[in-house]
């Protein structure tokens, strides 16, 4: 097997629904692609259910078709922009931990085959702390935890970080505050989370910024597009471009953790 081109693998997650995680995944992916990065967004939530609403796309095939040998991973990719594609993972993710050795090998080959066509893999996980979420997050190189200004958001984010740290030794997390009314509000949310993690866990948290509450985001969703395209000069669009700039500066780790082949191996391993 050829050595895989190093790919930055980022899992976007949050301890609960309603934090705008899918919107973050999609807009971050679009912003990175606008910078010239080749991005694959893996929808690991409910197939294209959420991403479909945001991008107006329809998937003919899913990862399950690749596992059954009906098509290649490249044939499953749905192009969303010039340098952005989506992997509709829908039904395939349900059986990720029950793959045969042959399917396991096929999946690694499949991702290895498309490694050369991408620089970044963004994984939009489901809400909560299900086995599927844990699998995707612990396999990724970077974990971006999205929080918003609701009391349960911080509590649920802490529960997710605690589980990943205690059971899977994930010890480094990036935190993004979404739908904030000021950057200070975002920093305050991060401080609350940092206070409890510093007290009870051995983890490193890094604040990566905030996305402002912006009516343009809701209007873009109604138009089945992203705020970066519908309202490119909006406050939210500007914030997403700043976030993409920061993410682009994150190093691709030299260790195998986060490389595609390793990502898939971790994904299909029984915990």
Name each model-derived stretch.
Residues 113-116, 130-152:
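Inter-motif core of Ras-like GTPase G domains
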Residues 9-73, 120-123:
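Walker A/P-loop NTP-binding active-site region of P-loop NTPases
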Residues 42-116, 221-226:
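P-loop/Walker-type NTP enzyme "switch/lid" segment
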Residues 227-271:
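NTP-binding/hydrolysis catalytic cores, primarily Walker-type P-loop NTPases
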Residues 15, 148, 173-187, 210-217, ...:
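G-domain G4 guanine-recognition motif of GTPases
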